[in-house]
Every structure is written in structure tokens, then in C-alpha cells.
From Swiss-Prot:
Single GO molecular function: oxidoreductase activity, acting on NAD(P)H, quinone or similar compound as acceptor
Protein name stated in the entry: Na(+)-translocating NADH-quinone reductase subunit D
Keyword Cell membrane among UniProt keywords: yes
GO BP annotations listed: sodium ion transport
UniProt xrefs under InterPro entries: NqrD, NqrDE/RnfAE
Length: 210
């Protein structure tokens, strides 16, 4: 059983120290597509966290019984099954959000973060640490998504979770929404600023000069 210190490290390290988007530059496509609203970013975070944690758990449980030649296929089958479960739950209980997320829920199957943790960690580790690692990397992914979604929705529409936060000019307020924040390039800019901020705060993440 992992100690409390190891569990804390596994959960918190992917948020800043080894963030899958900011440091490893993985899972960027969905970060651009689902962050126009904080609500969709939050749901996508939960979906990826669920899939990453349980795919790690199941891969770890059967890792000694998977032939090396088909390990990627087995991992993909497990991940795909979990994604189908998530997709069906969203369709049943959060249909409007499911429509907004569109194909990007299905594309979790090909998300490099999920595949990477299954191959690099779960195949070599015990079930509980693998499950915790999945939660941690899901949180790291979600940290970027939720931060980007927060600024895009707030500055792009003056709302958060669909509720008006900044009084809009059209309603007699003072804020004029910035339409650029609702376009995909704004997510690139925000992720770039986040990477800069994290690497300023964590200079050890800077790449060595050639």
C-alpha cells in the first residue's frame, strides 16, 4: 500500500511539476475544443480522469497476463470500453453537454495522456498506485482545461457556468465580450501563457540550451 506522502505526490505532481499538457504537450486538441465553456471543461476533466484512472487500474490488474505483442491492442480495448461507458452516461444524464462535447468524448480513446499512462506506468506498477496515478494525471489535464475554460468563458461571454458574472453592454452593463476568446486560437495563447507561468515558477522545467 502506498504511503500518504506517495499518494499526495502521485496526485499533485502532474498538476504543476509534470503536467501532461503544459510540460509534455499532450492532449492539446481537446484543450482547444472543449474549453469555450467552463461547464464542458469540467465535465471533460471528469471524463478523462475516470477513463485514465480505471484504465490504469484494469491494465495493472492484468499486466502479467498480457502478451507483449498485443499489449497496445488490449490497452486500447480497455480504454475504448471505458469511453463508451462515459459517453452513454453523458447521453443519459447530461445530454446537452454530451452534444456540446460531440466527438471529443470518443477521442479520449486516442488521447496520448491515457495511452501514455497505461503503457508507461500501469504496465509496470501495482493496481492502487496505477489508479492514483490516473487520478493525478486526470487532475493535471483538468487543471489546464478548467483554467483555460474559466478565462475563455469569462472574457468571451462574461459568464461562468452559463451565469452572467460581468454586466454586459447590451444589458446596460460595462463589459463588451471579447469574441476572440471563443475562437480556438485563444486557447493556444492561454496555454502558452500557462506554460510560461509554470516554467517561470518552476525553472527546472526549462529545456537545456543546445
Amino acid at each position: 500500500m502506498s504511503s500518504a506522502k506517495e499518494i499526495k505526490k502521485s496526485i499533485l505532481a502532474p498538476v504543476l511539476d509534470n503536467n501532461p499538457i503544459a510540460l509534455q504537450v499532450l492532449g492539446v486538441c481537446s484543450a482547444l475544443a472543449v474549453t469555450t465553456k467552463l461547464e464542458t471543461a469540467f465535465v471533460m476533466t471528469l471524463a478523462v480522469m475516470f477513463v485514465t484512472a480505471f484504465s490504469n487500474l484494469f491494465v495493472s490488474l492484468i499486466r502479467h497476463h498480457i502478451p507483449n505483442s498485443v499489449r497496445i491492442i488490449v490497452q486500447m480495448a480497455i480504454i475504448a470500453s471505458l469511453v463508451i461507458v462515459v459517453d452513454q452516461i453523458l447521453r443519459a444524464y447530461l445530454y446537452d453537454i454530451s452534444k456540446q462535447l460531440s466527438v471529443f468524448v470518443g477521442l479520449i480513446i486516442t488521447n496520448c495522456i491515457v495511452m501514455g499512462r497505461a503503457e508507461a506506468f500501469a504496465m509496470k506498477s501495482a493496481p492502487i498506485p496505477s489508479f492514483i496515478d490516473g487520478i493525478g494525471n486526470g487532475l493535471g489535464y483538468g487543471f489546464v482545461l478548467i483554467t483555460v475554460g474559466f478565462f475563455r468563458e469569462l472574457l468571451g461571454s462574461g459568464k461562468l457556468f452559463g451565469m452572467e458574472v460581468l454586466p454586459l453592454v447590451k444589458d446596460g452593463g460595462w463589459y463588451q465580450p471579447n469574441g476572440l476568446m471563443l475562437l480556438a486560437p485563444s486557447a493556444f495563447f492561454l496555454i502558452g501563457f500557462m506554460i510560461w507561468a509554470i516554467r517561470t515558477f518552476k525553472p527546472e522545467q526549462l529545456e537545456a540550451k543546445e
